[in-house]
Amino acid sequence: MNENDENGPSTRLTRAKAAALTTDAPAANGALKKPLQTKKAATGANGTQRKRAALGDVSNVGKADNGETKDAKKATSKTGLTSKATMQSGGVQKLSRSNLSRTAVGAKDNNVKKPATEAKRPGSGSGMGSAMKRTSSQKSLQEKTIQQEEPPRKKVDIEKVVEKQAEAVSVKGDVKAGAQTEELEKPQDFVADLDTEDLDDPLMAAEYVVEIFDYLRELEMETLPNPDYIDHQPDLEWKMRGILVDWLIEVHTRFRLLPETLFLAVNIIDRFLSAEVVALDRLQLVGVAAMFIASKYEEVLSPHVANFSHVADETFSDKEILDAERHILATLEYNMSYPNPMNFLRRISKADNYDIQTRTLGKYLMEISLLDHRFLGYPQSQIGAAAMYLARLILDRGPWDATLAHYAGYTEEEIDEVFRLMVDYLHRPVCHEAFFKKYASKKFLKASIMTRQWAKKYHHLYIDSALTEPYNSIKDNE
């Protein structure tokens, strides 16, 4: 065969064949050297020959013998990290490349930490957010466990807080007890100076408030009407006066005017009727004109004269109302200096610590004096004191002490007569519907209902006779 023939079959020249060709005397030594044999292909457990993949595992471990390799790994793991050479060198292992790699691998196996793998910079969409949430939840769990491990200290703190609160409550109790003992030690005629609280408020005029109310008490005697003026009114009766005032209360409520306006209007009517004779058909005109004058005197924005003409069902023209206004003012000599009972009620309410319920009932009881002619002979300060006394009695607010008597200006004995007249009016059947409905609303705390219920139960303690007839049946001479 020609060796240079490129189309001929190529023969493989191995190292053994090359050695045989180069040997000059192969039989000189008497024994021929065996040629180097090629490495046998690895066979599997079934004896079949297995080919190694081009880029497969270098360790020649295939799928067929996974069990054998696992057993081998288990055996090597049992022996530990120290090799035979390490044992012979007295426990000091010589550092070599293989040893370094093995030591690093062993250290990695023994010191595996989950956060170390999570600390790598993740790519987009690698789920790093969930890993961070997991670590934060682990931290919160650790904090919870730390908090659960500290109950004794917290219990001690809570006990200290409870002890401090108990001490504070005991101190408050001691202060209250001391205040109560001081109140008990005070004499019964002790009068508290309540005006010193208003020294910094210029609107209260605390420096000369005493002189102001002394002047009002002098002035109220000058503005009292004649309690018997009905005697020289041939066409009028007390019943008609009550009907007129009840209608004026309805007008006053519709226009939403001040309480002072209503009291001044009724006082103007009584003072004018004490000086002039009025026919029955002109009585309503006197009432409308008096309300018009009072609204001008007390209100910031008073209703127009046309409004008063309208509420009177156009019975009187605007000119008639204006003419009546001029005539009334001329008769009274333009004297509108009327000491309103609301001023006295506010003065007494200061000693009552401005209790809103007591004050509302007091306003209702004071307005009784507008409808009942029997109150015409009493000054407004006495009516205000009696109203406050009865309101406190109904609400059970305590006795009429020296402080209340000082700021009211009347003792219990001095207001007893007016007080009994109020109980008498409350005990009788209702005859002034507008007045009763006004104070039966929630705005006025249902004062008319409450006071009448009280009078029905306790009237026998303060008035002698059990009155059943309505107020309108009272004779003029009573």
Swiss-Prot record:
Biological processes, Gene Ontology terms: cell division; G1/S transition of mitotic cell cycle; traversing start control point of mitotic cell cycle
Matching SMART domains: CYCLIN, Cyclin_C
Pfam family membership, one: Cyclin_N
Region (Disordered): 1-153
A GO cellular component annotation in the UniProt record: cytoplasm
Polar residues bias (residue ranges): 77-102, 133-145
Comp. bias (Low complexity): 16-31
Keyword Cell division: yes
Gene3D superfamilies xrefs: Cyclin-like
One of the record's GO molecular function terms: cyclin-dependent protein serine/threonine kinase regulator activity
InterPro entries in alphabetical order: Cyclin, Cyclin-like_dom, Cyclin-like_sf, Cyclin_A/B-like, Cyclin_C-dom, Cyclin_N, Cyclins_cyclin-box
Extent of Basic and acidic residues compositional bias: 65-74, 110-121
Biological role stated in the UniProt entry: Essential for the control of the cell cycle at the G2/M (mitosis) transition. Interacts with the CDC2 protein kinase to form MPF. G2/M cyclins accumulate steadily during G2 and are abruptly destroyed at mitosis.
Protein name (database record): G2/mitotic-specific cyclin-B
Species whose genome carries this gene: Emericella nidulans (strain FGSC A4 / ATCC 38163 / CBS 112.46 / NRRL 194 / M139)
Gene name linked to the record: nimE
